[in-house]
Amino acid sequence: MKILVTGAAGFIGSHLCEELLKDKKHNVIGIDDFIGPTPFSLKLKNLKNLLPEKRFTFIKENLLTADLASLLEGVDVIFHLAAIPGVRSSWGNHFHPYAAHNIQALQRLLEACREHSIQTFVFASTSSVYGEKQGKVSENTSLSPLSPYGVTKLTGEKLCHVYKQSFGIPIVILRFFTVYGPRQRPDMAFHRLIKQHLQQKPLTIFGDGQQSRDFTYISDCVKGITAVLGKPHLIGETVNIGGAERASVLKVVSLIEDISGRKATLHFSDKIAGEPSNTWADISKAKQLLHYDPATSLKDGLTNEIAYLSSLYQGE
């Protein structure tokens, strides 16, 4: 099976490529243009295990300008993870790249799929499409994104649906809930807090720290993504990919202190515009359709991320 992963040098994309290559029948093409909040050096490090693989081909190109007809030649499955991520930086003058890469690039890819016989097109969406909600959210919950980023991802979902309805593009939408673990982006909360703690700096808490998230460990997330393979009955479905545990930011800080054996100093700052107070995934559908069973505890997952970042920032 020939599989295309967009955003292959990213946090989730690089882990996904590695998991796909465990199956000797898979040949993986990864495309990435090294844009977004993650530095070039870290994205290159993400690819370290992949580049020597004979069944992996890496292409450094932008989906807005790439020759998609050539790229999609013989491709069976597409995992479209490439996007400009993050709520904070999607406001104001920073919005243009979000619109270009999260909407226009997706539309180009969907349009190109009209000329190719793709088995499955998996679109990576986000819990940000739900907005401010109380309690668990199922896939049928009303969608009210709070940020320009969330709006671009919801627009992406709508594009996927119209291309399925009009041209039969076999889309599956997965909504990720706060994925964490080794290789997590530097702008994400866990990475930022752990780095500050390792460097013995005050930990910046946006808001009062009581906001909570459904945290999904990277290996659990990737298992959910790859479970889509070989399931044609999933075409047209939207599925939440959540974690084994949810917690407040202050609870996460407490776990970081426990794991590191050192107390943290906290610096409280203004709440981020566009961030919901809570997220909580109802993963009943994922369990039913994907046999999805996230098993990594928050403490175990944080321990792994701390070990990774300790190695990454050693000597700084």
Curated annotation (Swiss-Prot):
Keyword Lyase: yes
Enzyme Commission number: 4.-.-.-
Keywords assigned by UniProt, alphabetized: Lyase
Any GO molecular function: lyase activity
Annotated positions binding substrate: T126
One Pfam family hit: Epimerase
InterPro entries (alphabetical): Epimerase_deHydtase (IPR001509), NAD(P)-bd_dom_sf (IPR036291)
Enzyme class: lyase
Residues annotated as the enzyme's active site: Y149 (proton acceptor)
UniProt keyword Amino-acid biosynthesis, yes or no: no
Extent of the signal sequence: none
Family to which this protein belongs: Belongs to the NAD(P)-dependent epimerase/dehydratase family.
PANTHER family: DTDP-D-GLUCOSE 4,6-DEHYDRATASE-RELATED (PTHR43000)
Protein name (database record): Uncharacterized UDP-glucose epimerase YtcB
